[in-house]
Each structure stands twice: as structure tokens, then as C-alpha cells.
Amino acid sequence: MNAIMLTQEEMAARIATELVPEIKQYVPKVTSVYFYGAGCINEEVCANVAEAIRASVPAPVIEVATDLLAAARALCGRSAGIACILGTGSNSCYYDGEKICDNVSPLGYILGDEGSGAVLGKILLGDVLKNQLPKALCEKFLKQYDLDRMTIIRRVYKEPQGNRFMASVTPFLIQNIEEPSIHSLVLNSFKSFFVRNICQYKGHEKFSVNFIGSIAYYYRDVLAEAAAAVGCTVGTIIKSPMEGLIRFHSMPA
């Protein structure tokens, strides 16, 4: 549920129809709700989300924050550190144990999002169409995904959510990571993520860099290699924030 893409009424309707039926018996007992989501970028948006939740779950405490803060809390708890998201998109921050103190804007998959699924997929598709990979590998890719040049162009430029389409082909990379050309593609994108994002945080060399998301999780070995190449150290890598968030919200403040 992206808070920027939906009105308060649309969010309230979705919560009422998709969430509440699953937790109906618990709603009267709920005293606190912590919601982390994409698009929760300012107080106005967060207030709209809180009201949408309150319409179905009238808890005394409703806290709304970004998915990046969720990553920081899940990865670092109440300790300072660098927290990153590497999934379809990418993001990062310096977190002081309470709040996000610095954030290099990810800029999305056109201008940024280095190391993300969308960008890895974009590079892969471009390399296939421009014959930058071995011929046998290009043919294998096109056959595996039943794609051709015009289909790729249509999916990227004309159909909605081109970024998700590009991210959807990244399993090919991990399946063929032993191929030197594929390994270099992934390694260079991860290096770019560290150089263009992490190395901008003051004192970054004092902290390990922690990650959440499917790309970080499945490509952890190449990610660690990229980090070492630019003088960084990878710390915790998890696929999902839920366990870490439960642990965080169970801690005494």
C-alpha cells in the first residue's frame, strides 16, 4: 500500500476489506499500531495513513513511518548504524538508534537505485539486446523468459510498472552468477551502490553496512565482495523486517 498513490478513503477501504477480516477478533484488544510503508514521506501523508487505520482499528497509539525506518529498526534495533534496502528498488540511511539522521536520495531506477532489482534487470536487458554477453547466454535468457527485442521494449516503455518487469528477470543473474560476465554485471552495480550512497555518509567506515531485501539476501556473497572492494564491511543481511521489528517493539524504550 503506497501512501502517495492512494487517497485516505482508498487506504481506509483497503484496510477494512483486506486487513481487518484477518484480525477481526483482535481489534478490540489492540492498543498500539505501528505501520511502516512506502510513500510515508512527510507528516501530512503519515497523518492520512493514521486516520485511514483509525477508521477500522481505533487504537490509542498509531505510529506511521517510512519503510526505511522499518529497515533501520529491524536491522540496528536501538544502536547506531547504516541500514539499507536492496529489493526492487534501493535505499539507505544513517540511523542513530532512534531516528534517520542522513539519507542519500535513491532517486528511483532511472536516475539511481544502484544495486536494486530494477537496475540489475535494466542492465541485463540492455546487455542482452546490445550483445554485451556471450551469444549462448543471450539466447538462453531470451528463451527462458520467452522474450524478444520488441516485447522487451514494450514491457519497459509502454506497459505499466516497467521497473517491476525489469526486476522480474533478475533470477537469471543468480542462476548464472558463475559466468564471468554476469558476475561482473552484479559486482559493478553493487560497487556503484556503495560508492554513490554509502561512502557519502560521514564516518561510514566506522560502521558495518546492514541490508534488508531479496536482492541483498540472495546475492550476499557478491555484495560482500563489492563492499570489500570499496573499503566497506557488510553486517547483518535479512530478507524480511518482521522478526526484527517485533524484537524492536518488544524492547523497553
PLM ranges: what are they?
Residues 1-33, 51-55, 75-82, 123-253:
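ATP-binding/phosphotransfer module of carbohydrate and carboxylate kinases, centering on a glycine-rich
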Residues 4, 39-43, 111, 158-161:
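Short, small-residue-enriched loops and turns at beta-alpha junctions
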Residues 36:
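Short, charge-patterned binding micro-sites
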Residues 40-139:
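Phosphate-binding/catalytic loop of phosphoryl-transfer enzymes
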